Regions:
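Short alpha-helix
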Residues: 124-139
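A short SAM/SAH-binding and catalytic strip from SAM-dependent methyltransferases
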Residues: 71-86
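Conserved Class I S-adenosyl-L-methionine
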Residues: 24, 143-193
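Conserved class I S-adenosyl-L-methionine
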Residues: 101-128
């Protein structure tokens, strides 16, 4: 929602929009309701129902050819997974028309530190400064916002449900939640997360 509000200050109409990582379509629905456009292109690793109605690319955006002559490229909570990020930003810059917009949100260093303290693993998130340095090489930054928020959950199950719904989990793949580890997490939960 913050991304949409920041973006809407600068752009209300964009003929050709490309969304990277449309996922379940939460941000896409904002675009559909509030932006005038001629073409919307969607990208995600997996097919979602919205992809039936718009030109789409299924697969890693780093391996896809980004449509050209774009007026707007958007992405919500995807770029923390992209390596190498600078290569993708170069592709985006080349695909945008001159003086058009690239707007995104992403998770940065410090995300889900509570979960990392329990699992002893986390993703190698970039710092805001590292992201700015990459951006300055390819774009003029019109607006930069950092938003730190803490979500609270009534119990361990609610936390895990939220992680599942958002796809954000901070894990690199070798942590498995077993009955024993769930019990330990539940015992250590005590309102910390």
């Amino acid at each position: 929602r913050d991304l949409y509000h920041a973006l809407f200050q600068y752009v209300q109409r964009a003929d050709r929009i490309y969304e990277i990582g449309c996922g379940s379509g939460i941000f896409t629905h904002y675009l559909l309701r509030h932006f005038a456009f001629r073409q919307l292109f969607l990208n995600d690793l997996y097919r979602c129902p919205l992809m039936e109605r718009y030109p789409s690319q299924i697969g890693d955006v780093c391996e896809q050819e980004i449509p050209s002559n774009l007026d707007l490229v958007v992405s919500s909570s995807v770029f923390q997974w992209i390596v190498p990020l600078e290569e993708l930003f170069k592709k985006i810059a080349a695909a945008l028309k001159q003086n058009e917009f690239f707007a995104f949100s992403m998770f940065v260093a410090g995300t889900l530190w509570e979960l990392e303290s329990f699992t002893h693993q986390g993703l190698p998130y970039k710092t805001p400064q590292q992201i700015k340095e990459i951006l300055f090489r390819h774009f003029d930054i019109v607006e930069w916002k950092e938003n730190f928020c803490t979500l609270s959950f009534p119990d361990c199950f609610a936390l895990l449900h939220s992680l599942k719904q958002t796809g954000v989990n901070n894990l690199q793949g070798d942590f498995r939640l077993t009955k024993t580890s769930y019990r330990k997490l539940d015992e250590s939960f005590d309102g910390k997360y």
